[in-house]
Amino acid sequence: MQSNSTGYKLIKIGSIVLILYVLIGGLFLPLKTGITGVSNGQLKSNEPQSFSVDLYNPGSGFVAEKVILKHKNLVFQSQENQYNEVGYLNSKINVVLGDTQHSQLFDVFVFGSSSVSPKQWMYFPDAVWVEKSISDTGVSNKIELSNLTSLVKQDVQSGFPNRPILNESIRNLLYHVPMWFSMMFLLLLSVIYAIKYLMKNQLKDDLWSESFIKIAILNGILGCVTGSSWASITWESWWPSDDPKLNGVAIGMFMYLAYLILRTSLKDPYQRARISSVYAILIYPIFMALIAIMPKLSADTLHPGSGGTVGFNKYDLDNTLRLFFYPAVIGWILFFTWISILRYRFETIKNIQIEREDNE
């Protein structure tokens, strides 16, 4: 990898353009309408009752067209909806489960229109518990599921998806996740150059490997900072100690910090390069197993996409967010690759100066 090549310039320019695009869009694109909570969410079947939905960013002049409770194929629609400008939607509904159903926990869907969008929808999972009453017998008053599906497809509101618990913090997806992609990419490059050193015995390859690892550690620190701030909002804990992915990250970070300590303890440059290269090659698959494989085998992780937890690609990553998420991943990878190249150049110049001073 030549630092003065056309590829270097493309990496530098590409990273700046993509990150600026992500920063501007990620900060200023509004969030879609969402639900932040549901009050009076315990109902009895076959009895007209009301519950309240707390809406976020619905837009002025919002009108609730439909409020729906859904559990698998059971779908019920409210009979009356009243919205006030404070952000609360009061819905009256009479759920008749019928003689073939039991008490169930329902998701809430709200469909409406406002000055923001003529068609918009939002939902909140596991929001309303319907207790089956003794008088609930006979035929259920559920509606067809196809009605709900067609309404969801009519959503034309622009903006980032507004998901329960995440809300505005979903923007952190453009920073937190790319940090770990960047770290894994740089660590892979460090392994490649470690192998090159063992094959060719050239110190420049060891310097490349060291540069990639040091910037990857910076990625890990930034990933922990952005992740902890996110966790404090969504999980109400800066570092949930029982999450296997977080524990795997902590172990992996200490493994690479040990790499730096190992290098400082070895004075001979060729011995340092040889031992460090072997160490870098050995710990990379262990690190990947700790952060990518072990969490998927655990049932207790809080991170999306692991241990049965729904992943962003199935739950939150809609088309609007994809337009920024994928450029964010590429942009941050290019940016930290550029920083790694700059560090390599700095260390190369410093080594040349040291050699000149020794010769004098």
Where are the regions that the model predicts?
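Polytopic transmembrane helical bundles with strong interfacial aromatic enrichment
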Residues: 2-41, 82-86, 122-360
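Extracytoplasmic/lumenal ectodomains and periplasmic regions of secretory and membrane proteins
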Residues: 98-140
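Immunoglobulin-like IPT/TIG beta-sandwich domains and homologous Ig-like subdomains
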Residues: 45-114
